[in-house]
Regions:
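Residues that mark the junctions of alpha-helical repeat units in TPR/alpha-solenoid scaffolds
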Residues: 21, 57, 93-95
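Structural motif corresponding to the intra-repeat A-B loop/turn of tetratricopeptide repeats
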Residues: 2-3, 35, 71, 107
């Protein structure tokens, strides 16, 4: 599967540049995310949203939020999840709200770990 993704990415990069809408960039961003190419995922999805004519903007926002989450850009992640949470689709709304809570908890956890690490280093 990973090998197939590696082959698909260059093709999607070319297709995204030629496409008249942003949907191909969204798909490319999802491929990047699945390959842990997080900065590339953010860039591609943002380009797709900017280009417009995206089939499911809220789903794209969820994916963008997930990429930001993985990069520990928690504020940007929550922003994207909040936009997605405005969707009329109850499933999208529920998923987005779950991600918001999860992101808030992870943000606290990461800050606490940093505080503990700093404290331990100051004692040693």
């Amino acid at each position: 599967m990973a090998q197939e993704m590696e082959l698909a990415i260059p093709i999607m990069e070319k297709a995204a540049k030629l496409a008249k809408d942003g949907q191909t960039f969204i798909i490319l961003g999802s491929l990047y995310l699945s390959e842990d190419k997080l900065e590339e995922a953010v860039d591609a999805i943002e380009q797709g949203l900017k280009k417009g004519k995206v089939k499911d903007e809220s789903q794209a926002r969820l994916t963008l939020g997930q990429a930001h989450f993985e990069l520990q850009n928690f504020e940007k992640a929550k922003k994207e999840f909040r936009i997605a949470a405005r969707d009329d689709d109850k499933k999208i709304k529920k998923t987005a709200n779950s991600w918001i809570k999860y992101t808030e908890n992870e943000e606290i956890r990461v800050k606490n770990l940093a505080l503990r690490r700093d404290y331990i280093q100051s004692q040693g």
